[in-house]
């Protein structure tokens, strides 16, 4: 069957927590602080082809909570997924990997981060929604401004939350 007759295919094969780390360098003293922490959140995405039509997409989020100048906790989590993507026009593949896949993975990542922070004894942190289309467009703009030969990992987006 010629390629032009094949229907585009986008399927989730698997969603998994690729990595999770939590540090509490100032526990237990930090629990006695009455001030609310300030949060710094950084987000990055990457997609890699694993086989013909099979891609791994990963969203990484780092959350650092500080009270005054002391770190209350630092969480880094990587949520990944295996996606089968076939017969997609070339101009649609990168947006599918940079927008579609992260949009699917991010809710799982948000839940895993909130759970880890709660299990560490802190109030849950509910990360804001991310518009991955705007994130992707910003990444493309940043790529155009950088020199060739840079890493395949997408630049991080930093968010501030109170």
Curated annotation (Swiss-Prot):
Gene Ontology biological process terms from the UniProt entry: protein folding; protein tetramerization; protein transport
Entry GO CC: cytoplasm
Keyword terms, alphabetized: Chaperone, Cytoplasm, Protein transport, Translocation, Transport
Localisation: Cytoplasm
Primary residence: cytoplasm
Signal peptide (residue range): none
Single annotated GO MF: unfolded protein binding
HAMAP family reported in the protein's UniProt record: SecB
Function: One of the proteins required for the normal export of preproteins out of the cell cytoplasm. It is a molecular chaperone that binds to a subset of precursor proteins, maintaining them in a translocation-competent state. It also specifically binds to its receptor SecA.
Family statement: Belongs to the SecB family.
Subunit field text: Homotetramer, a dimer of dimers. One homotetramer interacts with 1 SecA dimer.
Protein name listed in UniProt: Protein-export protein SecB 2
């Amino acid at each position: 069957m010629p390629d032009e007759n094949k229907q585009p295919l986008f399927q989730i094969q698997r969603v998994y927590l690729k990595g999770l780390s939590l540090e509490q360098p100032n526990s237990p003293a930090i629990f006695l602080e009455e001030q609310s922490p300030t949060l710094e959140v950084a987000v990055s995405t990457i997609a890699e082809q694993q086989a013909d039509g099979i891609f791994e997409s990963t969203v990484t989020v780092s959350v650092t909570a500080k009270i005054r100048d002391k770190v209350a906790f630092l969480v880094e989590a990587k949520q990944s997924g295996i996606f089968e993507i076939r017969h997609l026009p070339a101009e649609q593949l990168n947006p599918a990997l940079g927008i579609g896949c992260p949009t699917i993975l991010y809710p799982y990542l948000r839940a895993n981060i909130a759970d880890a922070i709660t299990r560490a004894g802190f109030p849950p942190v509910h990360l804001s929604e991310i518009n991955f289309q705007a994130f992707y467009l910003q990444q493309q703009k940043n790529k155009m401004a950088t020199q060739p030969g840079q890493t395949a990992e997408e630049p991080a987006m930093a968010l501030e939350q109170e």
